[in-house]
């Protein structure tokens, strides 16, 4: 896929039929935030609330993410946020490999346009698609990886923290490391 301006990429994404997720979506959840952000957060895919509103991270997990951002002095409008897949998988299941492969060119294009210095992978699915297909979130989260001049880190997805609040301490350590890296840019 050739590098497209963000608006053209969005329009192409709206008309996408590259996988079966297009058959069940209410809305494409493209991404949002500052196009000039130094930091980009990438999640797995839209949930029910996101599919209904067409915006990323607006449900309970999004509310928790907002609090986590505020704790390191960031606001949603300061960052750019997107997902690996742009359409909701049925019953919030993990996206299938063919769905990820259909959508990943859109995300790569978004990353190229936003040109962040830091990418934060929220959860295992994002980390596997961006860092390493064998990524294990519990063993490998909180470490920095360098790719083409971009610092990449993975932490728990906010939905995982809602299911298992015991992981919040580790996520907080990750967010402090993110804040430190951002402050030193």
Predicted regions and their residues:
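A polyanion-binding, active-site-adjacent surface
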Residues: 1-185
């Amino acid at each position: 896929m050739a590098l497209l301006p963000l608006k053209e990429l969005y329009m192409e994404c709206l008309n996408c039929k590259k996988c079966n997720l297009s058959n069940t979506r209410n809305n494409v959840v493209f991404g949002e935030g500052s196009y000039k952000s130094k930091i980009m957060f990438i999640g797995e895919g839209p949930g029910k609330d996101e599919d209904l509103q067409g915006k990323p991270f607006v449900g309970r997990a999004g509310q928790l993410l907002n609090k986590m951002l505020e704790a390191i002095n960031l606001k949603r409008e300061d960052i750019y946020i997107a997902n690996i897949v742009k359409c909701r998988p049925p019953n919030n299941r993990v996206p299938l490999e063919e769905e990820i492969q259909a959508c990943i060119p859109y995300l790569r294009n978004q990353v190229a346009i936003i040109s962040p210095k830091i990418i934060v992978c929220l959860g295992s699915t994002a980390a596997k698609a961006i860092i390493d297909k064998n990524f294990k979130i519990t063993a490998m989260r909180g470490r920095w990886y360098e790719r083409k001049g971009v610092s990449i880190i993975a932490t728990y997805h906010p939905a995982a923290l809602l299911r298992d609040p015991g992981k919040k301490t580790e996520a907080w350590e990750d967010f402090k490391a993110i804040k430190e890296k951002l402050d030193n840019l």
